[in-house]
Amino acid sequence: MTEKPFPDNTPPDAGERLAKRLARQLNCSRREAELYIENGAVLIDGAVVEVLSTRVHPGQTVSVAPGARAEPVPPVTLLLHKPAGFTVGDGQPSAWNLLTPERWQQGNTPAPLKMLSKHFQNQEPLLTIPIPASGLTVLTQDGRIRRKLTEDALFMEQECIAQVQGRIVQDGLQRLCDGTAIAGKRLPRIKVSWQSEGHLRFALQGIFPHEIEAMCAGVGLELVGLKRLRIGRIALAGLAEGHWRYLQPWERF
């Protein structure tokens, strides 16, 4: 028995899919047409369109930017200065809502030729920090970055500033450096120093930011704020809170 094709319920006046129109116009495959669209190289009546599901009407003009190529958009990595209280998981307020053109901090470093909608699809957060914490957050589409930050997570140094209150126990700073015990687990030696009154600087290796609260509690301190400044060789630097930038091709964790 031959199956009936799935019915096309699209209203007749909804127009034609952009990729179909473009493929016919350029005499190329539908996939090549989609790649032109994803690269931000397709214009409808002079306006750039990157949404594959876009439909066009016969009277509209579809054009392709000069020099455009039908190539896959290379994966990118985004660096976000996450504000305290924002989450990269489920829930609100969502850090994903901060990834807007208005919050793109370009600075003085070269950036990709142009920002594309494709850059914000299938981004994966890595080495996340607790929701109450702020600071450097990494989101990537790049499998090489994903492997690096996953496989080398225990060896990657992370620098954090912990805002604390309370009275530290005698030799508490040395105990933090020597590696305290949490839930029966002995933590490795790390570098901890006073940055200023009420602020401890942690250089973590083999320890993750979410463990700092228990470490502080073990020496009589209450953690009231946490900010991650650096992961490996990538620092927060001048990235403003709530803003983001692209990881540049020459930068390495």
Please report, for each region that a protein language model flagged, where it lies by residue.
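Basic, flexible Lys/Arg- and Gly-enriched helix-loop patches that mediate nucleic-acid binding at interfaces
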Residues: 2-253
